[in-house]
C-alpha cells in the first residue's frame, strides 16, 4: 500500500483505488500525465486499451481536466525512445514512479534438469524512483521483484 500513497501536508495518505498516471511525450518536447482511473478493476488488455486511447487524446489536445488529475502512481517509458534505463522524477504528491527501459533480446542462463543452459529472452530494465520519507530501499526492491514476477508469469486476463 505504500507505493499507492501520497504525502499531503506531511501526512501519508493511503489510496484505495490505483490511479496510474502515464507520462506521454508531446511533439513540442513537453510532457503530460493522463490518468487511468481505477486501474485495479481492469485486466492488462483493458489497461492497454485505456492507455492507448488516453495517449491519442493527449497528443491531439483532447484531454479533459479529469483526465489529468488524481494519479496515485506514475509510469514513464523512456524505452520507447530506445533508452535502456531512465531515472524519473516523482510526480508529486505521488511517492513513486516506475520507469521502463527498451525491450531487447539478451542471452540468459537458466538452470534445467540437464544443467545450465543459455536461452535468448526479451528483457527490460525497470527503475523505481521513490520518496525516501515513505519508502525505503528494501520496500522498493520488494515492489520491483513483485512487478518482475508479474511480468514473467504474464496472463493478460489477470488484474493488476
Regions found by a protein language model. Give the residues of each.
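C-terminal catalytic/motor cores of large multi-domain enzyme assemblies
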Residues: 1-160
